[in-house]
């Protein structure tokens, strides 16, 4: 699997991105800005990520 931009800084969080179901980009944004907060335009991602945090 290719390393996506931004994941190298947080290699331990790549699993969280995948578990969130919102894709690497939305997962990265949510993780960097405010973990656990609803990501704009990603309702399903938020719901799936809630138990993960």
UniProtKB/Swiss-Prot annotation:
Keyword vocabulary terms for this entry: mRNA processing, mRNA splicing
Keyword Transferase: no
Any Gene Ontology biological process: protein stabilization
Positions of region (Disordered): 1-53
InterPro entries, sorted: HOXB-AS3
UniProt key word Amino-acid biosynthesis: no
Protein task: Blocks the binding of HNRNPA1 to the intronic sequences flanking exon 9 of the PKM gene by competitively binding to the HNRNPA1 RGG-box motif. This inhibits inclusion of exon 9 and promotes inclusion of exon 10, suppressing formation of the PKM M2 isoform and promoting production of the M1 isoform. Also suppresses HNRNPA1-mediated processing of microRNA 18a (miR-18a). Promotes MYC stability through interaction with IGF2BP2.
Assembly and binders: Interacts with HNRNPA1 (via the RGG-box). Interacts with IGF2BP2.
Protein name per UniProt: HOXB-AS3 peptide
Species of the source: Homo sapiens (Human)
Source organism phylogeny: Eukaryota, Metazoa, Chordata, Craniata, Vertebrata
Encoding gene, per UniProt annotation: HOXB-AS3
């Amino acid at each position: 699997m290719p390393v996506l931009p931004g994941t190298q800084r947080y290699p331990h969080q790549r699993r969280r991105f995948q578990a969130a179901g919102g894709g690497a980009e939305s997962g990265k944004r949510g993780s960097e800005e405010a973990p656990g907060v609803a990501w704009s335009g990603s309702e399903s991602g938020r719901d799936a990520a809630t138990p993960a945090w």
